[in-house]
Amino acid sequence: MKKQNNLRSLAAQAVEQVVEQGQSLSNVLPPLQQKVADKDKALLQELCFGVLRTLSQLEWLINKLMSRPMTGKQRTVHYLIMVGFYQLLYTRVPPHAALAETVEGAVSIKRPQLKGLINGVLRQFQRQQETLLNEFATSDARFLHPGWLVKRLQNAYPTQWQRIIEANNQRPPMWLRVNRTHHTRDGWLGLLEDAGMKGYPHPDYPDAVRLETPAPVHALPGFAEGWVTVQDASAQGCAVFLAPQNGEHILDLCAAPGGKTTHILEVAPEADVLAVDIDEQRLSRVYDNLKRLGMKATVKQGDGRYPAQWCGEQQFDRILLDAPCSATGVIRRHPDIKWLRRDRDIAELAQLQAEILDTVWPRLKPGGTLVYATCSVLPEENRDQIKTFLQRTPDAALSETGTPDQPGQQNLPGGEEGDGFFYAKLIKK
């Protein structure tokens, strides 16, 4: 492999782009993975996800072991040292290989003169590891979350906040959705067993299966044929609450990448579905999902605040609004969220959600159902949002999910369960 494609330096560059430039890892990582051999792609992903999951610990260690921060053109070295710490702490990479490859990464980023510095810091960490980790265990950084988010979780969940944080810091389970138009869930579980894998059904979501051990999609029976889709169990709750029926006109708003659009069509293959998203690039994923599953829907680019631009005066029997949110319920899947979000974002998102709710509600037919969903765990985006919507919307009534005082159903992330998710089912009187 070429020297400039040193895995550790690529991981350092990816993390730097996320933390310093505010880019999402899902945008940064794929082009970098094209630069490495197939056998190394999984390790590159592990290093990027792992460093972002434990970023506050790695930052704390650097501050302890270095007298001044790396700045300017040397900044990538700061993240390269983090990659070194992460390997020594959390991976099975032999320490001598972790050190050698990380030090060599300095050459790839054209900072060969800093090889000695990197080597010295990593070796100092090895010598002081036990003392440093004992001290870290009592520091504020031990939660591996930004302080503002810890405070919000403490306020919202006085008895559960630590469990939420622990769940966010874990590796997520792999959940699948069995396409009921091809197989029953039990039938597909039998095929999975025949393929030498084991899965477990979810008690509440009838299409959801958790793999005992995550696996590449090409190993899953019938993935290419559309028999199964990768989708978290909690995300599958949207179609369960929406309960789409054949022949209905259904709006899936904020639809990309299309997991919920295709789930609606699996439940109601004869439904007339309009899938809308503001992000034209992400809409290509909706088309890809529809194509793999052999389904048809109308797909449009549009802003949820201006429905006249993409649906004229149409009204719908059912609307799924998977609202733009902080994504604080899916941190274990997307650890970069912790460092991309800011405290001020929450009020701005809540305002945007309220605007979309108010403008899309008139597009629901009388007697129709709207499911408001987010992958957030923050009440400002969830229960508080729906409570104030019900107060200002006299023809809206809550159904199945919670009470007027505590509207909606809040799933919290945890262990082998689904991600953090919120649903409120509303009926138009």
Curated annotation (Swiss-Prot):
Positions of the UniProt region annotated as Disordered: 397-419
According to UniProt, the reaction catalysed is: cytidine(967) in 16S rRNA + S-adenosyl-L-methionine = 5-methylcytidine(967) in 16S rRNA + S-adenosyl-L-homocysteine + H(+)
Q: Which segment of the chain is annotated as a signal peptide? A: none
Where is composition skewed (Polar residues) in this entry? 400-412
- GO BP: any one term: regulation of DNA-templated transcription
Q: Which residues form the active site?
A: 375
Q: InterPro entries of this UniProt entry?
A: MeTrfase_RsmB-F_NOP2_cat, MeTrfase_RsmB-F_NOP2_dom, NusB-like_sf, NusB_RsmB_TIM44, RCMT, rRNA_ssu_MeTfrase_B, rRNA_ssu_MeTfrase_B_ent, RsmB-like_ferredoxin
* Keywords of this entry: Cytoplasm, Methyltransferase, RNA-binding, rRNA processing, S-adenosyl-L-methionine, Transferase
Localization annotation: Cytoplasm
Listed PROSITE patterns: NOL1_NOP2_SUN (PS01153), SAM_MT_RSMB_NOP (PS51686)
The free-text function statement in the UniProt record for this protein reads: Specifically methylates the cytosine at position 967 (m5C967) of 16S rRNA.
What is the protein name for this chain?
A: Ribosomal RNA small subunit methyltransferase B
List the source organism: Salmonella paratyphi A (strain AKU_12601)
Lineage from the top down? Bacteria, Pseudomonadati, Pseudomonadota, Gammaproteobacteria, Enterobacterales
